[in-house]
């Protein structure tokens, strides 16, 4: 085959590859069939690639040898968590219903096992849908543990222990992340979010360690279902990294709904007793619970992939180092999703996977774009944000920042009598009038914020927000009626140094 | 019919006695007594937590009015949880801060700020709400 020449006289690498074509079993082999892996496999196949994918056997609780098609999000993450959040929300709704004329005369009981069964049925249904999506895209699915044995070779250890090797022009690591437990004496008595979503018995007394979104969500879930909940976290407020004003409101709402908050407190020891699990806090206090949840972080699933032996660079946390196109230092090996520890959210993994497929097989090199990624914390009521927090805006500012806030008791609460404020906030760059951050804590925050995220992605100005007619009566309309500035933050230029 | 009425009366009495005993038991715990004693002994009382931003906001309102409230920092007391529970039963809210003026419940942080901005708080305290007016 004649080699094509480029204008500058260099050999066209693609043509050269074709000329010296090596035969591979697959154009792409994906390790991990979670959100990112399945998306990458399907979209690459749609571009005409021959694709193989491997995933560990299914079980709701993961381990190094257990997983399931659908990955964390579908099996032991966002989806089952949201189902439990819905379940927990009904408790408050029933209370609120009384002032709306609903007479609930009989004792209302909550049956954990019934909800658990419904949740399991749903994740099994989704697991099958994901398998069908792969089959419909002509992606070959292998059940077993994959590891990289060369720049173009993957070995899959099947359930019966036999190992089969496959060659591929490209290998994609999409193995996600797993919950970790801090090394506290007695840590084996604690559970992670995996087990929390599949508990046999409902915990009447729960202790949660952690200040992140998973900790806050489970505290809300269990409290909403009637448990006594104690939440321990290291900082003064939960949800480090979110807007401070929103963090304060989330803390207040948790407390208002009956969660016992223990700020600036960690746990030093867990022991098994007849009464339950005894916990000692860093302040020397003793607590007893049926369940202790450690929600202190997750780490990338890369330990058993043999990546370093092949020369793939990992960071200190074990995350796969990649460039803007999700490519590792080995040109044939790529990685997306939590395994790369960039922004660990399902929709981000989906975006990275789409960009990968376009780059590797679509003839359209595409970088993942991480600005204005919206996200939500499904505590009760939820928090949702997009763009910069007030603190981030001040940190990154090149000019003055305008902060607009609206705090109010939602219309529904005025009748139900619930004392729970909603807070909405816009951060505006004064010079350009662009809205650079939005956040909301209150009912339907996530649903509302998705629309706001589109506006921010389009570079909307505060004037454009103001000229938008609101939907009345709704909480959402507050985002287009914030006329007066709550505070102006003057830009403080960073001191120049000679360093 | 008379029998039905007397049964109803008995049931009503039982319910009333149960309710009164519940209220009195809630109201007669050592923590509830502490809350009541504290709010009756001081002009301004704030039940607070040292780290809480809403509590800081409520305290700053009284600073603006040159008033010194009596502050109970629940997170710095051994019995803080129990006091918070008792407080919740008395005022119907578990959140902090809870502010009392002259023995009467004013409310939380937002209520305090609203009362300050409307001039109601200054009136309750018998002080001038506008510092500039004093100059």
Swiss-Prot record, chain A:
GO molecular function terms noted in the UniProt entry: flavin adenine dinucleotide binding; glutathione-disulfide reductase (NADPH) activity; NADP binding
Binding site for FAD: 35-36, 55, 72-73, 81, 146, 338, 346, 472
PROSITE patterns in the cross-refs: PYRIDINE_REDOX_1
Binding site for glutathione: 35, 130
Names of required cofactors: FAD
Reactions this protein catalyses: 2 glutathione + NADP(+) = glutathione disulfide + NADPH + H(+)
Enzyme class, broadest EC rank: oxidoreductase
Binding site for NADP(+): 211, 214, 217, 234, 240, 297, 376
Residues annotated as catalytic: 472 (proton acceptor)
Cell compartment(s), UniProt: Cytoplasm
NCBIfam families: gluta_reduc_2, PRK06116.1
Protein family per UniProt: Belongs to the class-I pyridine nucleotide-disulfide oxidoreductase family.
Extra remark beyond the main annotation: The active site is a redox-active disulfide bond.
Subunit structure of this chain's protein: Homodimer.
Protein name: Glutathione reductase, cytosolic
From Swiss-Prot, chain B:
NCBIfam families (UniProt xref): GRX_euk
Keywords for the protein's UniProt record, in alphabetical order: Cytoplasm, Disulfide bond, Electron transport, Redox-active center, Transport
Function: Has a glutathione-disulfide oxidoreductase activity in the presence of NADPH and glutathione reductase. Reduces low molecular weight disulfides and proteins.
PROSITE patterns the UniProt entry points to: GLUTAREDOXIN_1 (PS00195), GLUTAREDOXIN_2 (PS51354)
Disulfide bonds: 52-55
Residue span, Glutaredoxin domain: 32-132
CDD domains: GRX_GRXh_1_2_like
Protein name per the record: Glutaredoxin-C4
Taxon lineage: Eukaryota, Viridiplantae, Streptophyta, Embryophyta, Tracheophyta
Coarse class of the protein's main subcellular location: cytoplasm
Family the entry assigns: Belongs to the glutaredoxin family. CPYC subfamily.
Keyword Cytoplasm: yes
GO cellular-component term (any): vacuole
Cytoplasm is among the record's keywords: yes
């Amino acid at each position: 085959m004649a080699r094509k020449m480029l204008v500058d006289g260099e050999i066209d690498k693609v043509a050269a590859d074709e000329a010296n074509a090596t035969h591979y079993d697959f154009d792409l082999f994906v390790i991990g069939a979670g959100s990112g892996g399945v998306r990458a496999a399907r979209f690459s196949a749609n571009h005409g690639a021959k694709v193989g994918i491997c995933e560990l056997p299914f079980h709701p609780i993961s381990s190094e040898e257990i997983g399931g098609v659908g990955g964390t999000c579908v099996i032991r993450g966002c989806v089952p968590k949201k189902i439990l959040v819905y379940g927990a929300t009904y408790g408050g709704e029933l209370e609120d219903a009384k002032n709306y004329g609903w007479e609930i005369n009989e004792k209302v009981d909550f049956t954990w096992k019934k909800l658990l069964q419904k949740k399991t049925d749903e994740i099994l249904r989704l697991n099958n849908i994901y398998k069908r999506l792969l089959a419909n895209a002509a992606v070959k699915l292998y059940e077993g543990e994959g590891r990289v044995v060369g720049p173009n070779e993957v070995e899959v250890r099947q359930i019966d222990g036999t190992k089969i090797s496959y060659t591929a022009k490209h290998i994609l690591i999409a193995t996600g992340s797993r919950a970790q437990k801090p090394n506290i004496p007695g840590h084996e008595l604690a559970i992670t979010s995996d087990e929390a979503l599949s508990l046999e018995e409902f915990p009447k007394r729960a202790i949660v360690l952690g200040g992140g979104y998973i900790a806050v969500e489970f505290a809300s879930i269990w409290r909403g279902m009637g448990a006594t909940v104690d939440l321990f976290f290291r900082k003064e407020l939960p949800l480090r990294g979110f807007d401070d004003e929103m963090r304060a409101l989330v803390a207040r709402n948790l407390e208002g709904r009956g969660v016992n908050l223990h700020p600036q407190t960690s746990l030093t020891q867990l022991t098994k007793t007849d009464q339950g699990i005894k916990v000692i806090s860093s302040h020397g206090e003793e607590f007893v619970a049926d369940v202790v949840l450690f929600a202190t972080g997750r780490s990338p699933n890369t330990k058993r992939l043999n990546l370093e032996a092949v020369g793939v660079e990992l960071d200190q946390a074990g995350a796969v180092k990649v460039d803007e196109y999700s490519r590792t230092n080995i040109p044939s090996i790529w990685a997306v999703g939590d395994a790369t520890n960039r922004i660990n959210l399902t929709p981000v993994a989906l975006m990275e996977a789409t960009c990968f497929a376009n780059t590797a097989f679509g003839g359209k090199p595409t970088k993942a774009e991480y600005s204005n990624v919206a996200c939500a914390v499904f505590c009760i009521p939820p928090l949702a944000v997009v763009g910069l927090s007030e603190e981030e805006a001040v940190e990154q500012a090149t000019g003055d920042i305008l902060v607009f806030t609206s705090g109010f008791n939602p219309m529904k609460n005025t009748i139900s009598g619930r004392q729970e404020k909603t807070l909405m906030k816009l951060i505006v760059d004064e010079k350009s009038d662009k809205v650079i951050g939005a956040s909301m804590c209150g009912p339907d925050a996530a649903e509302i914020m998705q629309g706001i995220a589109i506006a921010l992605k389009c570079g909307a100005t505060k004037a454009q927000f103001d000229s938008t007619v609101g939907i009345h009566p709704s909480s959402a309309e507050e985002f287009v009626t914030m006329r007066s500035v709550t505070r102006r933050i003057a830009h403080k230029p960073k001191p120049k140094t000679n360093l | 019919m008379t029998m039905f009425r007397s049964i109803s009366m008995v049931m009503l009495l039982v319910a009333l006695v149960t309710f009164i005993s519940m209220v009195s038991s809630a109201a007669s715990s050592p923590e509830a007594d502490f809350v009541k004693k504290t709010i009756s002994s001081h002009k301004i009382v704030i039940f607070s937590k040292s780290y809480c931003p809403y509590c800081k906001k409520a305290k700053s309102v009284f600073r603006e009015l040159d008033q010194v409230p009596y502050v109970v920092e629940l997170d710095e007391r051994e019995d803080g949880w129990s006091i918070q529970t008792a407080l919740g039963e008395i005022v119907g809210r578990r959140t902090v801060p809870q502010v009392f003026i002259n023995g009467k419940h004013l409310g939380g942080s937002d209520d305090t700020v609203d009362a300050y901005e409307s001039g109601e708080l200054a009136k309750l305290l018998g002080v001038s709400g506008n510092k500039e007016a004093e100059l």
